[in-house]
Amino acid sequence: VRYDARRIPLRSAIVLTFVSIERFTTMTDRRSGDSGSILFAVTIFTSAFLLFQVQPLLAKFILPWFGGTPAVWTMCMLVFQMLLFGGYAYAHLLSRIGSNSRQALIHASLLTIAALTLPVVPAAEWKPTGDEAPGLRITLLLLATVGMPYFLLSSTGPLLQNWFSKACPGASPYRLYALSNIGSLLALISYPFVFEPLFSSTAQAWLWSVLFLIFALSCLMCSWKTAMAPATSGTGNEESPTTQTADDVPLPRVRWLILAMLPSIMLLATTNEVCMNIAVVPFLWIIPLTLYLLSFILTFESDRFYRRRPMILLTACSLCATMLMLSRGSMSGVVFQIALLLGNLFVVCMFCHGELVRLKPDPKQLTAFYLTMSAGGAAGGLAVGLLAPLVFKGYFELPLALVACLLICIGTFLRDDKQFQQRVPPRTTLNMGAVLLGLCFIYFTCFAQHAPDVLDVKRNFYGVLRVENDVLESNARPMRDMVHGCVVHGRQFVDQDGRYQPSTYYSQSSGIGRTLLTVDADRPRRIGVVGLGAGTLAVYGRSGDAIRFYEINPDVIDLARKHFTFLDDSHAEIDVIPGDARLVLDRETDQNFDVLVLDAFSGDAIPVHLLTSEAMRIYMRHLSDRGILAIHISNLYFDLEPVVRALAAESGLEARVQKCVQGSDGGVAFNSVWMLLSGDTSALNVACGPDASTAPHRVVYWTDDHNNLLNVLR
């Protein structure tokens, strides 16, 4: 993707930013008679930009350390939401202190402490060793690296809006909230198109740290201006026609909490669904988060973007369509599924945030309002990041959230009916919805997880695994599959002869099948395999061979031993090493592998950290002089051949591409593409078939510090 092609959305975002700041300051200066409003506008905008720029930055930084799983982003979002809640709580408590000068002094002191924790570059000591809980380690890593700066950035929005209402009496602070969301949106749009392709991860972290220092100085100026402002009894009185005070609304804080929590759940659940079988990359994290923020901008900017009755109808239709799509599963195309999921997320966020705006209080309760909203967002993060993996064995949080949103839609529609309002108290409506949602929760917990053909289901930090019984369509042979999401990671036929037959991506006609059948046939071999799956490659082991599997997911190891016999049936000596393969190989002494296999891709998701120059140096250290590196690059969405060819060229190896066609080997093979790399041409001549490709191809260099999947998008 050329930089010029990325200018248009970035230019539009920058224009929108300056227009919004100019519009806000012009209106505010006219009403308050104070020209200092631009300082508050720029400070809040900068804080929001930094707040959302650091999220993909740090998530990408640590992604290689924790196996490249979507759960890394979910845990990062959870930690950031909890810090956001902490920042809002701090702003709420600080605003209760009567003296403006005391508030300014406390905040200035904390800003100074935060500046001392820079830069936000994660220390190598935080890399996992393999025997700790990844979720806890990610939490501690983020708190140690960016906890204090992020906490203070989170507090900036509500705190400066409160200070602004004192320094510029007569002006509404709520437009500052829309302005902050524009800053957040610009951060998200600019990251994948500007900062990620142009700067290394370390350079991004240092640049962010410098911008934080500039923000801190600007914030100190705002605090000084507030300290100099005279004490006032009011905080501004401009209200939109739909604004209601807390006393006018039944159960106001419960509604604020629910309406903030549901979009948060939908955001994380939708992101999981989209990333699970495409790629764990900032670009795909950012699209849902951008839609989430855009709904905030539109609803808080003006009530003209939210029309209640049409939005209720649109939301109900969108929710029903998404439920139907999820029930049909793979019958819908991938592009259609993603478009519907993202469209539904935006509609739901518009509905929930539009209702939040209708219920917003006067500025006197501003910090309490934002605190409750952030509590709802944090509760949604906890529900998806911690509660759902403990309670559900599948990804049921999305359908459950869809049901909850539909109930809120119905309840909102009924509350507009005056006759219904007279007959049914608000608490009764809330209780009825809670009961129905509880019944759905029981269904997903107790019944939906037990399909008749599913032998076992496990869910952990790395995703959902299933072992299923099935039959081969061509000849009705009974078989057993290990499935991650909707992708088969290993298959074994259960009849006596078929249990020793390799299939799917590892059949005898595949690139890896040809290699393991022919290479060094006259002597014992040492074989390394990154990614266990069902253990299919163990069937290629001969007496005297040693096969060493590396597997990051402990549930994969458990299911492979429990439900498949490949490991037990192999004639080779088998070792299964738990932990991230790259980290384990980096710590191990040289293994002198004759063949090293990279097959750690979950569906079409790409663990980028396994295809960088730094990773390649580790593999080369463990290969024998005539060793072959076999890399599985089958993928619907990304062309990984340029990346692998770059690795081969950098290491002085020859690279060949071996393809296998669906239905080969008696109908048991899948379409597969393997790349074989070696410094010994004779070894490749033996391993590759006559159809292996050696055609020249463009190259794309990836390093740990600088890589971009947009460069290899098909």
Language model regions located:
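Alpha-helical transmembrane segments of multi-pass membrane proteins
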Residues: 3, 11-12, 16-691, 697, ...
